[in-house]
Amino acid sequence: MIPFYKLERYEGNEALFELVMMSIVASLVGEPLHIHAEGLRGTGKTTIMRAAKGILPNITRIKGCVYNCDPAAPHCPHHRNMSPNEISNLGTEEIPMPFLEISHSAKVGTVAGSVDLARLTDISHPEAQLLPGLIPQAHRGIIFIDEINRLADTSPEITDILLDVMGNKPGHIQIEEAGLPVVDVTVSVSVWAASNPDEDPGPVEEIRRQLSDRFDMVCYMGRPNSVDILSQMLKENSHQWKAQAKEREAAVEEGKNEVFRSNIVKWAGQYEKADLPDFLRNYIARLYIKHNLESIRAIEAMQSGAILHSIIKGRDKVAINDVTHMIPLVLKHRVDSDTMVRMINDVDSKGVKDGILSFKNRKKNDKEADPDYFPHNATPLKDIRRSDLVNTEKSLTPNEG
């Protein structure tokens, strides 16, 4: 596989590269960011996502823990009730951030967990224990699903598991086996998915709308339209190039990957301290109300996405463009096309900068609260005579009677 740093970047896949980096940064600080890439088959969606496995940073876990327990916050059935001293005695180890895939042939037990047959059939010491599935083993990492629209259509049980995992941050998963107690495990995992909405069974939002809403952001993967880029892609995928690359690029590849890892760790530190200014938060809230959006997940994703986007772009503060850049990514799969067009036209017609800055410069007190607000060309109330202030029926109808 072509290493991540050598993958060709062009306008059509720029958004996916950004979302991949943003999701890794968020995952490293324990905040999953679920992303979905849509596009024509063969445009490189899965290639980019799988290649990102090579740049994932390390995480620290309790030594030998298959649930990837954080030593500072153990969550698995074996370690969550242990004291800090007991955890310290077990020791810790560093491993690459998990990256696991759910295939379309996977069973519920493979994904969630099942009886550990190796221990159950151990002749010397047989015992019944649960073996965590792919999702619990991917805790603090990434789960990737290719052609998720097909999975949503053909595997409703696995889709239900994903809904639980992605419903909250962190999510949870329940492992059930006959004869054993039910185990509920916290899981902090970012779900990455790819699909072609133009092929059967269609877009995810038309198959399981709940699952579609669970994805924080969705981007559409465009085709390359440059002769130079396509020529370079062909070259890097030729047999001769791959054979030569094995010999000359092993050390170079690791060095390049380390640069990505260092940046990710740096960005994660910045993200933990970063926040969105109130005037931008007010703008996002106004979008939710004005355009009658359904899911609060949408504006939560818009907030975290704007912060992450500003960080990977090297900015110290969140810019207005970071927020507007998130609008189509966050709302494409949540609103109909007419609503999306109205929102984009609304932002364009009013002027993004002027519209958002009106919140930044808005005074907290209304003008009416200002004692100088009302004009002073009227007679003060204290100077009006009672006869002028209180009208009787006779004064109002002087010509009657």
Predicted regions located by residue number:
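Basic, amphipathic alpha-helical bundle interface domains used for macromolecular binding and assembly
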Residues: 14-15, 155-159, 192, 225-337
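Short amphipathic alpha-helical segments at helix boundaries and their inter-helical linkers
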Residues: 31, 126, 297, 334-342
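Pre-Walker A (pre-P-loop) alpha-helix and adjacent loop at the N terminus of AAA/AAA+ ATPase modules
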Residues: 2-41, 116, 306
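Conserved, well-folded catalytic cores of nucleic-acid-processing
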Residues: 19, 23-30, 55-59, 114-121, ...
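Conserved interaction-surface patches within small, structured recognition/assembly domains
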Residues: 2-8, 145-146, 286-293
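Canonical AAA+ ATPase core
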Residues: 35-40, 47, 51-90, 94-99, ...
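C-terminal engagement/docking regions of AAA+ P-loop ATPases
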Residues: 36, 41-47, 286-289, 311-401
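Short, contiguous clusters of charged residues that form electrostatic/catalytic patches at enzyme active sites
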Residues: 18, 22, 129, 282
